[in-house]
């Protein structure tokens, strides 16, 4: 196979032999995409009256085809060319200096140009080869002695070595590995010829993957690598299952700032405004599946896992109970044990010291919750059922229902924030909000006076309303708009790939729009902490839920919450006559939100098919000090 230097010799020799000809010559040159294009040869300088031979090269950073035209004569040690664009504009001199036969590279110097470029050349009898163009104003010998920096053949970034058969950077290496390992399917929103360079490589995953393959990255090399150990289990049909990973650019904190609401007169236009916001990059399979070890219940004792979410504290209770064969005195325990069928997983193994302390702290919390369910006779003021004797309907309610201590509602987000917003991070944030909402309810003395069964029944009936009010209150901290937009994009892609039915997508999409509209309306009303607290209390003490006992007492608690709410609004906003009415009219919208869909969106990736109702009793049994220690320990 001829080298590029030999081809250059042939080109110059043919050039000298063609000077005596009077007719232009036509040459066929193979382009990088494998097609053949007929090109009219043009002279490189005015002194030469006949056409010259040319080579076509492609700049990987711009995707632009460039002509290298032979010029001058063959005297001297160096072969000289003219580098021009396709239209012949912006010419610059290129000197073929030498070839490194060991690496199959040809080094060119362009003294007229600025910066360092990297091109590829292809001819009918020579495959694509690596050409480094070195631009410098210094002398040629000085340039050749410099250490040339290898660039990624895909995006032009600084290469870290040869990966999967091609010289690439770490970014393209990781992208190619994830794409091939997980059999990801991408879609190009353009014409499948997007520019892939250091700055725009994340804009189109389809074109980036095609470029990786075209430039020599081998899929077989990835498939031969060791894959993580995993336990087979049924894939959840939930629309936010843990096998999905939502990739969103981290620098866009408020991608929907220009979209004041999801609801417009045209449903299609509101969806398009989300999908075209430029914030959503791609949805890929979860790194949890490939970067963690899924364990079965009989391995819980042997593994020192990183219990990195509050929800895992609760779900681990089932595994702990089953592995140690603890006695079951609560029917809820048998329900939550379904978590041990494969839906509970521990994150990537952390350092031993840190893992041991976290596991110890988590298991201590779980043991306390379990002991409270087994030894209800030993209940104290910390236990929900400690005041179960105060449930008579005739008990007078003394003092205010809510104190200043119930106004504070501070959500601590997981730290550090991951580079990409993934399902695990969303579920962890949502679980913290759910725990905080339930412990807020438990801190109300009147709530504890209802007794264990009634308090659990109330929270089971209204947890979705408390959670939605918490989302609205913490929408800035949680960046709710970004999360909901990610869900919309996920549904859009799932429908395109026939993963979800149109009816299912419509049902979930309507739920998302209702939730977004509710959050937007609360932000527009500038609801303060006291108002949020009273709205939650009114939603919590709702006597119209089926299966409640002492309904009249619950009704009195709701009336008291309303009266205190009215007094506060009247004193704080005396000029806003209709403020109380506007706030109360937002509560019916919460009843329109489907609790099952909320579970799918925010929690299914973490607890699988287990319902929130099953873990509510254990959340309510956690002591406040244990809850706070989990938050502090996992955030530091």
From Swiss-Prot:
Residues within the DNA-binding region(s): 149-224
CDD domains the record matches: NR_DBD_TR2_like, NR_LBD_TR2_like
Keyword DNA-binding listed: yes
Gene Ontology biological process terms in this record: negative regulation of DNA-templated transcription; negative regulation of transcription by RNA polymerase II
Zinc finger (NR C4-type) residue numbers: 152-172, 188-207
Keyword line: Activator, DNA-binding, Metal-binding, Nucleus, Receptor, Repressor, Transcription, Transcription regulation, Zinc, Zinc-finger
UniProt domain NR LBD: residue ranges: 382-623
Signal peptide range: none
Cystine pairings recorded for this chain: none
One term under GO cellular component: nucleus
Gene3D superfamilies associated with the record: Erythroid Transcription Factor GATA-1, subunit A (3.30.50.10), Retinoid X Receptor (1.10.565.10)
Entry's localization field: Nucleus
Molecular function GO labels: DNA binding; DNA-binding transcription factor activity; sequence-specific DNA binding; zinc ion binding
Family to which this protein belongs: Belongs to the nuclear hormone receptor family. NR2 subfamily.
Role played: Orphan nuclear receptor. Binds the IR7 element in the promoter of its own gene in an autoregulatory negative feedback mechanism. Primarily repressor of a broad range of genes. Binds to hormone response elements (HREs) consisting of two 5'-AGGTCA-3' half site direct repeat consensus sequences.
Name of this protein: Nuclear receptor subfamily 2 group C member 1
Organism the protein comes from: Xenopus tropicalis
Source lineage: Eukaryota, Metazoa, Chordata, Craniata, Vertebrata
